[in-house]
Amino acid sequence: MSNVFTHINADGNAHMVDVTEKAVTEREARAEAFIEMASTTLEMIMSGSHHKGDVFATARIAGIQAAKKTSDLIPLCHPLMLTKVEVDLEAQPEHNRVRITSLCKLSGKTGVEMEALTAASVAALTIYDMCKAVQKDMVISQVRLLEKRGGKSGHFKV
């Protein structure tokens, strides 16, 4: 792990990292997020009785769209040509929550960690948005990188 912030230059100013000379490699990142809610809210999602429609399908599409738009949201993030984005949602009724996992892949010069994190985050936010009419105190938590492969820094896994 490095002890240098790559997005801060010698003058202390934020800048986009120059990846021109970096090698193109296969890159992959996985992330997760959780959204906790009342059992009644989760049951509405699981039974398909939510008045706004299929919450998981909408959250999945939102997460995929968000991964593709990450560079528009994170100021110093490079625009990337993603080759795969996967968002999975798992109801965990024993914990009154939904686990969201994301996977992003590409062949490129920079990693896809931010895309994976953005996908999981926006999927969780979409669940919140769709369910806020029935519950406003849902909690989004534990947004984190699970695994990253490729590039100079190598393999990272929680």
From Swiss-Prot:
Pathway: Cofactor biosynthesis; molybdopterin biosynthesis. It catalyses: (8S)-3',8-cyclo-7,8-dihydroguanosine 5'-triphosphate = cyclic pyranopterin phosphate + diphosphate. Belongs to the MoaC family. The gene is moaC. The keyword Lyase applies. The lineage of its organism: Bacteria, Pseudomonadati, Pseudomonadota, Gammaproteobacteria, Alteromonadales. InterPro entries: MoaC, MoaC_bact/euk, MoaC_sf, MoCo_biosynth_MoaA/MoaC, Mopterin_CF_biosynth-C_dom. Catalyzes the conversion of (8S)-3',8-cyclo-7,8-dihydroguanosine 5'-triphosphate to cyclic pyranopterin monophosphate (cPMP). Homohexamer; trimer of dimers. The keyword Cytoplasm does not apply. Its EC number is 4.6.1.17. It comes from the Bacteria. Keywords: Lyase, Molybdenum cofactor biosynthesis. The active site is at residue 129. This is Cyclic pyranopterin monophosphate synthase. Pfam families: MoaC (PF01967). Substrate binds at residues 76-78, 114-115. GO terms for molecular function: cyclic pyranopterin monophosphate synthase activity; GTP 3',8'-cyclase activity. GO terms for biological process: Mo-molybdopterin cofactor biosynthetic process. CDD domains: MoaC_PE (cd01420).
